[in-house]
Amino acid sequence: MFSIDLIQQIKEWKRGSTLPICLGCDVGGSGLRVRLSDFHDSAKYVDLGHAKAQKTAELLKVLEDLQQKILQVEPTTVCLGAAIAVAGPIKNNTVILTNWKGPAEERTLSITQLPKGLFPKDRSYFLNDLEAGAYGVIAAYEQSILEENFVQLFTDRAPTGPILAKGRTAVLAMGSGLGAALVTRTPLLKNPLVLPTELGHLQIAPNMATHKYFQDEQELIQHISDHYYGGKLDPEYEDICSGRGLQLAFQFYHKKLTGEVLPLEQIDAGDVAKKAIAGEKDAYNALRAHYIFYLRAAKAIATSLSCESCVLSLDNQVKNHPFVMKIAKELEEEFYEFIRPDWMTSVRVYSQKSILNFNILGTDYMAHAIANKPQ
């Protein structure tokens, strides 16, 4: 549950007979994070931290408790807009969260189930998690804090330029899955528009027989296909560009190195990344493959959507930043190795280097947008 001591700060925002606020919520694999902000000034906010929840019932209990604590602190509080980021396809304002385990009915959430005092009718919005992250990129740009959190990769091949392109920007992130969203700016629209996608589910484009990494890649792809598809179908990028994908890659390279087949339940993706950064060979090869295919996915997405910039974002990118920089030349080779090389010359790639919760920024941004929407 969230601390009432942090909530006390909202009392400072009261101006008249009521205290209008906005609420942004990011639901992750282990729970949720919430930001409360002043409706009149989004620069005034309080981040309540993390609360555990891995079932719908647990999430609702946390939010109902939060609603009670807010009213206990200031009974005149009214929420004018709310946005909540979730992992999974959203249909008819309902989502089955894909980063929680268990039966579907225990991880199904509808917007009508949320406490009305925090999520007002017609002023509340579900966001796909990467959609929220993309709106967070927009929010960070508008607050002039975007550039300081990223480094441009491959500067010997691409021109310098803004992270948030004047036209189209692809925002990608690896976590429990592989998310991708498109940010587009056009004179026809007052504000940038985010298009959520499911492009992480594109099937992998394999290299052909004379490529120097053909044999190794084919064996890895086959290993992943054997696990998920009975060895018949080409895996999707998310099958390797995700936490579960890193587990499978490590299982493959560990067996190749030692002959031992480790059960997946004994492999922790976070530990693999740490071992890779420390230079352990099987983990290094696994994390390298994880990122090679990530850049291949980024290449497919950026070229297909005619993007000027490509943003590799969120916490795992920051944690793995030293490794990314260590293999940057290999990643550059992968990204620019394309059947239409002239298409790649103007695409800029950026990697997040410091922690900034773009999902919370994005949900707060959209909460204020919906709160200020004309009736």
UniProtKB/Swiss-Prot annotation:
InterPro entries: ATPase_NBD, Glucokinase. Keywords: ATP-binding, Glycolysis, Kinase, Nucleotide-binding, Transferase. It is an enzyme of class 2 (transferase). Pfam families: Glucokinase (PF02685). CDD domains: ASKHA_NBD_GLK. It catalyses: D-glucose + ATP = D-glucose 6-phosphate + ADP + H(+). The N-terminus is blocked. GO terms for biological process: glycolytic process. Its EC number is 2.7.1.2. One of its GO terms (molecular function) is ATP binding. ATP binds at residues 25-30. Monomer. Belongs to the bacterial glucokinase family. This is Glucokinase 1. It comes from Trichomonas vaginalis. The lineage of its organism: Eukaryota, Metamonada, Parabasalia, Trichomonadida, Trichomonadidae. The gene is GK1.
